[in-house]
């Protein structure tokens, strides 16, 4: 089994030293879902929500969150992201919104946390914008879909819906 990288020999939390690592292209994708009543989703789709464009606001929030991950998650490195993408898709069949984020950089550490943070904060933003019309929306699951680059190799989540 792998070791926890953020715990030192004394069992204390610490920031991982990446100074000796090679710079490689690293990319991660994550997804999150927000499930809601069909009426709430319809307001988002037809643009009748009184707070404005829910998807545009959630997209911007997700992008901003990816850029601030180092400030939100202890022990994350500040990264020079070269690409952050947040896509939102209304899924009327399941009465939910699917959020997929992509983060990419050329650097010494991965971007999994940035991708997960982008998807999570976009989901939280949808909740925030729609809570006046529905408070029992459900956020989740949130998960890493893919990761590439770096010493630990590539990862691809099992597909399920």
Swiss-Prot record:
Keyword match DNA-binding: no
Residue sites binding substrate per the record: 75-77, 113-114
Metabolic or biological pathway, per its Swiss-Prot or TrEMBL entry: Cofactor biosynthesis; molybdopterin biosynthesis
Record's keyword terms, sorted: Lyase, Molybdenum cofactor biosynthesis
Enzyme Commission number(s) of this protein: 4.6.1.17
GO terms for biological process, alphabetical: Mo-molybdopterin cofactor biosynthetic process
Pfam families assigned: MoaC
Molecular function GO terms recorded: cyclic pyranopterin monophosphate synthase activity
Gene3D superfamilies: Molybdopterin cofactor biosynthesis C (MoaC) domain (3.30.70.640)
Catalytic activity: (8S)-3',8-cyclo-7,8-dihydroguanosine 5'-triphosphate = cyclic pyranopterin phosphate + diphosphate
Active-site residue list: 128
Task of the protein: Catalyzes the conversion of (8S)-3',8-cyclo-7,8-dihydroguanosine 5'-triphosphate to cyclic pyranopterin monophosphate (cPMP).
Quaternary state and interactors: Homohexamer; trimer of dimers.
Similarity comment: Belongs to the MoaC family.
Protein name per UniProt: Cyclic pyranopterin monophosphate synthase
Gene source species: Enterobacter sp. (strain 638)
Organism ancestry: Bacteria, Pseudomonadati, Pseudomonadota, Gammaproteobacteria, Enterobacterales
Gene name linked to the record: moaC
